[in-house]
């Protein structure tokens, strides 16, 4: 007797998801292209078991955050807008200042904008680890180097 073919949609179970750790060297990579690939892997869209409402993604460690590239005139024109929710609490930071002081924020902000803005998106975002410089504390997870074109 042969096995019958099932046409039911597969739905991943959280306990069955296998997580892999990846490391990305951001040196010389364009910010937006890198962020979209990171968001895809965090979400799990690179896996055949992808299920939209389940966290099927992998962990990402990004190093050399201060060496990411911005195309065009974004290094002079791009700004980050924050507000403290107090009167006069508007703060506008230029991207070149943010890269100098907190380079991790530039990559985190770009990736966060590409993830769903709900509970699942916050859970996915916690799997992103960004570091300035080449050292990171996740060597014990033996991350696989990921190449982005």
UniProtKB/Swiss-Prot annotation:
Gene Ontology cellular-component annotations: cytosolic large ribosomal subunit
Gene3D superfamilies, alphabetized: Ribosomal protein L13 (3.90.1180.10)
Domain of life: Bacteria
Transmembrane region(s): none
GO BP term (any one): translation
A GO term for molecular function: structural constituent of ribosome
Keywords annotated in UniProt: Ribonucleoprotein, Ribosomal protein
Function recorded in the entry: This protein is one of the early assembly proteins of the 50S ribosomal subunit, although it is not seen to bind rRNA by itself. It is important during the early stages of 50S assembly.
NCBIfam families xrefs: rplM_bact
Family: Belongs to the universal ribosomal protein uL13 family.
Subunit structure: Part of the 50S ribosomal subunit.
Official protein name in the record: Large ribosomal subunit protein uL13
Organism whose genome encodes this protein: Chlorobium chlorochromatii (strain CaD3)
Gene it is expressed from: rplM
